[in-house]
Amino acid sequence: MRRCSVAKRRALALLLCLLLLLCTACGGQAQEDAGALHCTVRIECSTVLAHMDDLKAGKADIVPSDGVLLPETTVAFSEGDTVFDVLQQVCRAQGIHMESTWTPAYNSAYIEGIGNLYEFDCGELSGWMYSVNGVWPDYGCSGYTLHDGDTVVWSYTCDLGRDVGALQGEPLTIPSRRCTRR
């Protein structure tokens, strides 16, 4: 009786090994990735290094010494994915804190903070901007659909984009904060 039990165990073990071999040969990451598109993503805040005096108290420790939160990283994405989708994906995968809100007026996500560095942390003109292939889109990141081979750079600006090359010679318009009483 015991002999039958040992034979059954061996047969079951062999069957499990064959199933595992079959699953790894047919499935796995390589096949999932085969039809995927790819882009590169970089997240940097090097402009803050020149404005450390303007940085909010307690924020100096979160700024990397080289200003790079995420070096250029290749990311697989699907057809129709946006810059926002890929930012969420890479931040989740790399353990980088990212916070956003939906802005109905622009029908897009607005990035409030990445790596615990938020808008206005380095002055009233500071915040996150993105470029794709060296171009700074004038619309939200969830409105930009990526293409295979795109290069996305998220940059923290301390001067409404001038310090990262987004506003080259364009006039700067800041809404008035004055209130008038009637």
Predicted feature residues:
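Ubiquitin-like/PB1-type beta-grasp interaction modules and other compact soluble beta-rich domains
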Residues: R2, A7-R10, L21-R182
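Short linear motifs in low-complexity or flexible loops
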Residues: L12-L15
